[in-house]
């Protein structure tokens, strides 16, 4: 489903074709002020490298906060952060809540099932009412691609919007925390070969990661998966496409595994989960094809025995749990940059 200009739901084709890599509602760069400062974080696509690096540098400063006895800084004291999750989430919602709390913000988690949207109220009417409650920052997850853009366009001028995942389009904070994780372990993006493996067609994380990797100068990004799960337009982005996992993994420095997003699939795109694992699952034997010091990442939720073997997920080259830890600092950085200096 997608959101029309009234905030109601409709046909996803109205916003974008799922087979295309780029989305049609991206006009200009509504994330930036006239001075080039970050007002909203809606997508990594179109962000200058300087802003991406600024977010990563700021996150590095916040990592140390988690090691303190008092895990708080006053950057968002007096600010109100509303978490608006129209889709279910565990890691993203929890880490945003922790991040906002550590910035000393007041945090409200909207119960969507009990809200007026479940009674037929339009998305924009909900947003306008919440803006009238003097919200400063909306963190939005929505099943419709483009919903955070709609909210950013129509919310009160003092309100900032962070996209916590919209349909198949983007998950910018996941992309940023993935970049922070890669930088932490590999330092220099300009010498890396990065493989993204699995259901790329339905993955907003893959889109955000690809935009971030190319923005930061990674010379070789590989997309590996079945033909039925690869979107069009990857080659035009400079991405190398592989339909054979063993070939695609040879010599890579970073492996980002993706789950099968069965909830977004229509029709039978794949055989059984067991058959998928035989062909596309990351096992210790396949991991050995990568560089000896390669790291393994996964945005979660992880399906063991489908896209990844437990020996790999729990092995010494896995940095999956560290991604979650770094995610708090990255989301602190994004909220601090977007809303910390606003009036």
UniProtKB/Swiss-Prot annotation:
<feature type="binding site">
    <location>
        <position position="204"/>
    </location>
    <ligand>
        <name>L-aspartate</name>
    </ligand>
</feature>
<dbReference type="GO" id="GO:0006207">
    <property type="term" value="P:'de novo' pyrimidine nucleobase biosynthetic process"/>
</dbReference>
<feature type="binding site">
    <location>
        <position position="301"/>
    </location>
    <ligand>
        <name>carbamoyl phosphate</name>
    </ligand>
</feature>
<feature type="binding site">
    <location>
        <position position="141"/>
    </location>
    <ligand>
        <name>carbamoyl phosphate</name>
    </ligand>
</feature>
<feature type="binding site">
    <location>
        <position position="91"/>
    </location>
    <ligand>
        <name>carbamoyl phosphate</name>
    </ligand>
</feature>
<comment type="pathway">
    <text>Pyrimidine metabolism; UMP biosynthesis via de novo pathway; (S)-dihydroorotate from bicarbonate: step 2/3.</text>
</comment>
<feature type="binding site">
    <location>
        <position position="259"/>
    </location>
    <ligand>
        <name>L-aspartate</name>
    </ligand>
</feature>
<dbReference type="GO" id="GO:0044205">
    <property type="term" value="P:'de novo' UMP biosynthetic process"/>
</dbReference>
<dbReference type="GO" id="GO:0004070">
    <property type="term" value="F:aspartate carbamoyltransferase activity"/>
</dbReference>
<feature type="binding site">
    <location>
        <position position="174"/>
    </location>
    <ligand>
        <name>carbamoyl phosphate</name>
    </ligand>
</feature>
<feature type="binding site">
    <location>
        <position position="92"/>
    </location>
    <ligand>
        <name>carbamoyl phosphate</name>
    </ligand>
</feature>
<dbReference type="Pfam" id="PF02729">
    <property type="entry name" value="OTCace_N"/>
</dbReference>
<dbReference type="InterPro" id="IPR006130">
    <property type="entry name" value="Asp/Orn_carbamoylTrfase"/>
</dbReference>
<dbReference type="InterPro" id="IPR006132">
    <property type="entry name" value="Asp/Orn_carbamoyltranf_P-bd"/>
</dbReference>
<dbReference type="Pfam" id="PF00185">
    <property type="entry name" value="OTCace"/>
</dbReference>
<feature type="binding site">
    <location>
        <position position="171"/>
    </location>
    <ligand>
        <name>carbamoyl phosphate</name>
    </ligand>
</feature>
<dbReference type="InterPro" id="IPR036901">
    <property type="entry name" value="Asp/Orn_carbamoylTrfase_sf"/>
</dbReference>
<dbReference type="GO" id="GO:0016597">
    <property type="term" value="F:amino acid binding"/>
</dbReference>
<keyword id="KW-0665">Pyrimidine biosynthesis</keyword>
<dbReference type="GO" id="GO:0005829">
    <property type="term" value="C:cytosol"/>
</dbReference>
<dbReference type="InterPro" id="IPR002082">
    <property type="entry name" value="Asp_carbamoyltransf"/>
</dbReference>
<feature type="binding site">
    <location>
        <position position="119"/>
    </location>
    <ligand>
        <name>L-aspartate</name>
    </ligand>
</feature>
<dbReference type="GO" id="GO:0006520">
    <property type="term" value="P:amino acid metabolic process"/>
</dbReference>
<comment type="similarity">
    <text>Belongs to the aspartate/ornithine carbamoyltransferase superfamily. ATCase family.</text>
</comment>
<keyword id="KW-0808">Transferase</keyword>
<dbReference type="InterPro" id="IPR006131">
    <property type="entry name" value="Asp_carbamoyltransf_Asp/Orn-bd"/>
</dbReference>
<protein>
    <recommendedName>
        <fullName>Aspartate carbamoyltransferase catalytic subunit</fullName>
        <ecNumber>2.1.3.2</ecNumber>
    </recommendedName>
</protein>
<comment type="subunit">
    <text>Heterododecamer (2C3:3R2) of six catalytic PyrB chains organized as two trimers (C3), and six regulatory PyrI chains organized as three dimers (R2).</text>
</comment>
<feature type="binding site">
    <location>
        <position position="300"/>
    </location>
    <ligand>
        <name>carbamoyl phosphate</name>
    </ligand>
</feature>
<comment type="function">
    <text>Catalyzes the condensation of carbamoyl phosphate and aspartate to form carbamoyl aspartate and inorganic phosphate, the committed step in the de novo pyrimidine nucleotide biosynthesis pathway.</text>
</comment>
